[in-house]
């Protein structure tokens, strides 16, 4: 608390008096979760100049669950530069120096979304209400949030634009689409994506030229295989489905890559090769299992071709590992 400048410190103490101790506290900010009608409240050490509706500093932010329609995004941005929203997470935030003025910001933003006010009307209403507030009249829009911050249905996952993209299992309502081939193609796609991410990380490291060349090859070939996997699904009318098992594999890839990132130079190179040997060995075993589960001949052929590439990658990794020991 002592590290906060005077104004943010005052805001933090005011929030503590109303909502209790914050759930998060660092040298740079305090955070409250599920405080009153708000999803989140932030008080930051950083202060930013903001001249609407009159000059002040921004350091206090209130966030609610709220779905902003795409066609209202520009109007909201023009209304108040300190009003922000995240359509993916389904959130809208107001940042100012007073809680009441953040409540006002959110109330008038809701009026814009619902068509009760346009941008300029909301801006003028904001200024008028602040003047009334300064006169001690306690306008309702400064005291009470008119928005029902429902915590359901505000998120927006958007839509894929890459042809043949996998779908999350929860979004597939037609059970006939949830066949073995749909999950198998998703497994192959996730394997490719995991290898692409690992190769991309290797490209950022100072590894020896042989390891770098190997990583670039894997990046290109797994990228091509990913494209072919998605195209196959399109041709066969099978959309890859991200089942919980597929997602577990994706998380496994991230977990293993996270152990490599802190390493540098030769240490990274050796660990990367060891990970490729382990990972490709596991993928071969998975492909053998999926070959027996596949329903269409086209998917079986693709798995066989993928297996050939994975086998080659495994052999090259083993040779590189041996050469680095010599």
Regions from the language model: what does each represent?
Residues 43:
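Catalytic domains of cell-wall/extracellular-matrix polysaccharide-remodeling enzymes
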Residues 170-326:
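His/Met- and acidic-residue-enriched segments that coordinate or traffic transition-metal cofactors
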Residues 1-29, 34-39, 47-173:
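Non-cytosolic coordination micro-motifs
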């Amino acid at each position: 608390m002592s590290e906060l400048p005077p104004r943010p410190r005052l805001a933090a103490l005011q929030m503590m008096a109303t909502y209790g101790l914050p759930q998060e506290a660092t040298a740079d900010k305090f955070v409250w979760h599920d405080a009153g009608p708000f999803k989140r409240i932030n008080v930051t050490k950083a202060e930013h100049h903001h001249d609407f509706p009159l000059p002040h500093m921004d350091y206090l932010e209130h966030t609610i669950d709220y779905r902003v329609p795409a066609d209202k995004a520009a109007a909201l941005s023009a209304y108040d530069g300190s009003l922000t929203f995240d359509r993916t997470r389904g959130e809208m935030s107001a940042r100012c120096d007073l809680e009441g003025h953040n409540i006002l910001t959110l109330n008038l933003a809701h009026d814009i979304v619902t068509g009760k006010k346009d941008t300029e009307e909301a801006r003028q209403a904001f200024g008028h209400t602040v003047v009334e507030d300064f006169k001690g009249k306690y306008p309702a829009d400064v005291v009470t949030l008119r928005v029902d911050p429902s915590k359901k249905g505000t998120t927006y996952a958007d839509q894929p634009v890459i042809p043949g993209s996998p779908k999350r299992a929860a979004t597939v309502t037609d059970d006939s689409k949830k066949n073995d081939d749909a999950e198998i193609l998703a497994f192959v796609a996730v394997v490719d994506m995991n290898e692409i991410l690992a190769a991309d990380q290797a490209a950022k490291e100072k590894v020896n030229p042989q390891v770098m060349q190997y990583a670039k090859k894997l990046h290109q070939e797994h990228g091509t295989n990913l494209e072919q996997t998605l195209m196959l699904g399109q041709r066969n009318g099978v959309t890859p489905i991200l089942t919980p098992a597929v997602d577990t594999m994706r998380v496994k890839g991230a977990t293993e890559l996270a152990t490599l990132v802190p390493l540098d130079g030769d240490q990274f190179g050796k660990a990367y090769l060891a990970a490729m040997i382990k990972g490709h060995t596991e993928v071969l075993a998975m492909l053998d299992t999926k070959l027996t589960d596949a329903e269409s001949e086209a998917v079986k052929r693709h798995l066989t071709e993928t297996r050939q590439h994975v086998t080659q990658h495994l052999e090259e990794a083993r040779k590189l590992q041996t050469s680095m020991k010599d």
